[in-house]
Amino acid sequence: MHVRSVAAALLLGLAWACSSGPSAPDDAAYTTELNAARITKDEAFRSASDSPVPEGKRDAVLPLPYFPVDPNYAVPAALKLSADRPVFEMPTSTGALRRMQLVGELQFTLQGQPRSLGAFVEEGTQQIDRLFVPFADLTTGKDTYSAGRYLDIQPTGTGYYTIDFNRAYNPYCAYNASYECPYPPPSNRLDVEITAGEKAPGA
């Protein structure tokens, strides 16, 4: 979906965008854990040989900017599976098309309104180890990156998740135009401000 080889363990820690069930986090411990993961990501982006942030830009880009942690943006969701996993050709930042299959729709309530986001995998994926959820919202192009943000979701056996927008992150093309990053499809554009997660670089 996108190149993200920097500190794989870091991204597992940072991007557990959804857990195995809809339990609410303990606010203090949750905030502490999330802030620690953000510091770890900054350190990796600053020092890793395969950092997506060009060396000459690191002082300007790092530390990465975020909205304050808000547990209200960690919401329970149910995954409605797609019967036939239709293929979508997602435009990308390089102009190429990325063929993705829709696994299903994550259905949830946010700010009192029912909403949904499509969850995708690369075409031909046999064993799903993560679901890819690109999205845009009313902060896109303002406080957040103009091409949208991503969530990574670990599949569960129950079909129930916790979507955590505090863990929304920028695609690598936000820092370096040489990366190819899929754009969120129109169906994954939320008509609400998601003031959680990573902001646009330099915001």
Where are these regions (language model features)?
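Bacterial signal peptide processing site
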Residues: 19-22
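Terminal leader/tail segments of proteins
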Residues: 87-91, 156, 187
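Bacterial N-terminal signal peptides that target proteins for export
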Residues: 1-8
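Acidic, glycine-rich flexible loop segments
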Residues: 133-169
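C-terminal partner/receptor-binding element of secreted or periplasmic proteins
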Residues: 173-203
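N-terminal secretory signal peptides
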Residues: 30-105
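Mid-length scaffold segments of soluble, non-membrane domains
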Residues: 81-146
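C-terminal motif of bacterial Sec signal peptides marking the signal peptidase cleavage site
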Residues: 14-17
